[in-house]
A protein has these predicted regions:
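Flexible loop/turn connectors
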Residues: 105-208
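Short hydrophobic segments within beta-strands
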Residues: 20, 58-61, 118-119, 146
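An alpha-beta-alpha
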Residues: 41-83, 87, 191-205
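Hydrophobic residues at beta-strand termini and immediately following loops
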Residues: 20, 32, 59, 89-91, ...
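Hydrophobic alpha-helical segments within soluble ligand-binding/sensing domains
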Residues: 30-58, 97-106, 125, 166-184
Length: 208
């Protein structure tokens, strides 16, 4: 978005700009992102190969670069594995209206929950688990829930999350290193730095 006085495109041509968690091939910036595709593929493969899941849905708000990439990666990997994809429980509203919550409640009431819910991030996954518990749906016995990001709460919640941990510390250090190396000189062209992720198993899939 840039600053209040300078649009991002002009800002990138005035000073070196590093963006974390998003990328744009049109802007001369250094973009540090995580391997969303690899992380989602690892989650889907784990659910299929270890837990025998044959139906799953993606749930979350499609309001960021990461969430869009994760949803697209989910659709692609699930199709490759021949998985039946339930109705996506999504919210693509920029107003963050939590439409996915309404969709999830409707699925619970209609008894149309899939075997697994792949959530776009950990915050969503933790909220989903709370909602399912209040509705009498057991995790992971009735529904498996997974997250993404590896935030601290994912490991300390009553039901620990199976999630994908992105290396936020390493991403921040790389961003600082890239800026330091530029010494105030803006980049001439876009650059993307993709960081590896790690599958972390928890109670929410039944592995721990």
């Amino acid at each position: 978005r840039g600053t209040d006085d300078l649009p991002l495109a002009r800002l990138c041509r005035s000073i070196p700009v590093v963006r974390i968690g998003e990328t744009d091939s049109e802007l001369p910036s250094a973009d540090v992102i995580c391997d969303n595709e690899g992380g989602i593929a690892a989650l889907v493969d784990h659910l299929v190969d270890v837990h025998g899941v044959t139906e799953m849905s993606f749930i979350g708000e499609l309001t960021t670069y990461d969430m869009h990439r994760r949803f697209e990666a989910f659709q692609s990997r699930a199709a490759e594995r021949g998985i039946a994809m339930g109705r996506p429980l999504l919210d693509d509203s920029v107003a963050s209206s939590k439409e996915w919550l309404v969709n999830l409640c409707e699925a619970i009431d209609a008894e149309q929950l899939p075997r697994a819910l792949v959530c776009g991030n950990d915050q969503t996954a933790l909220a989903v688990i709370d909602l399912l518990r209040d509705a009498g749906v057991r995790v992971p016995q009735d529904v498996i829930v997974t997250g993404f990001d590896g935030i601290l709460a994912s490991a300390s919640a009553p039901v620990t999350l199976t999630t994908v941990r992105q290396p936020l510390g390493a991403m921040g250090r790389l961003a600082a290193k890239l800026l330091d190396e530029q010494r105030g000189v803006p980049w001439d062209e876009p650059g993307v730095h993709r960081m590896p992720v790690k599958l972390v198993l928890g109670n929410s899939c039944g592995c721990v």
